[in-house]
């Protein structure tokens, strides 16, 4: 497939790094899903707001422009060789990215397990999980972490690695009383929430 790092949609946007960031995000989420639910060679549907996709491509495209660069004919090999021909649909600036079974299989067979995610999922699944246990788990994987209390009604605190370019996520936690829940955000998305 021929690929140009520029698009007619907005010729000032270099798309090649954006496609790489999108591919890595899709792989990260599939790995997390497989750690939680196990591997199945099946279609995976992941949802992104337009703002998140624009962060990947460092642009300000509208929904139509984003659909144009996510069309099958526009996709570079960095995505199709690994995840197959993904399909994107949009409703109200919310995008569904459908990854064919080939993508699940690729992640299962060609990426290493994320030991941190596996341990985190196991820990938060326990009914007596406490914040200090979560912090201790992060410290097991790095001495350089940031912990911050959040008072926004949705999350209680976040923890993030400061020295891992492969894991730049903000892991936000909320104590539901009987168990702990978490959601992870890329730095740009976390910033958008203005917590």
Regions found by a protein language model. Name each.
Residues 44, 54-87:
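Charge-enriched amphipathic alpha-helical scaffolds
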Residues 39-60, 116-123:
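Short glycine-rich, basic-tinged beta-strand/loop micro-motifs
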Residues 130-173:
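A cross-family detector of function-defining hotspots
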Residues 37, 77-87, 138-151:
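Short secondary-structure junctions
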Residues 4-17, 76-110, 164:
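Charged low-complexity interaction tracts in eukaryotic proteins
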Residues 112-147, 191-194:
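Short helix/turn-capping signatures at newly exposed starts of structured segments
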Residues 2-38, 112-113:
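Short alpha-helical segments that sit at the start of domains
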Residues 92-118, 166-182, 186:
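Phospho-regulated, low-complexity intrinsically disordered regions of nuclear gene-regulatory
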């Amino acid at each position: 497939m021929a690929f140009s790092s520029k698009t007619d949609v907005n010729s000032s946007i270099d798309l090649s790094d954006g496609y790489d960031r999108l591919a890595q995000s899709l792989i990260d989420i599939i790995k997390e899903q497989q750690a939680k639910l196990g591997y199945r060679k099946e279609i995976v549907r992941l949802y992104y707001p337009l703002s998140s996709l624009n962060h990947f491509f460092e642009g300000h495209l509208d929904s139509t422009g984003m659909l144009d660069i996510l069309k099958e004919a526009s996709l570079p090999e960095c995505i199709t060789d690994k995840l197959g021909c993904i399909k994107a649909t949009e409703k109200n600036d919310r995008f569904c990215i459908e990854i064919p079974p080939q993508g699940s299989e690729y992640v299962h067979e060609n990426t290493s397990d994320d030991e941190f995610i596996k341990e985190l999922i196991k820990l938060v699944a326990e009914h007596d999980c406490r914040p200090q246990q979560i912090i201790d788990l992060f410290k097991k994987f790095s001495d350089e972490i940031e912990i911050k209390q959040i008072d926004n009604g949705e999350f209680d605190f976040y923890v993030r690695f400061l020295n891992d370019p492969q894991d730049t996520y903000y892991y936000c936690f909320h104590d539901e009383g009987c168990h702990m829940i978490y959601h992870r955000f890329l730095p740009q998305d976390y910033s958008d929430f203005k917590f």
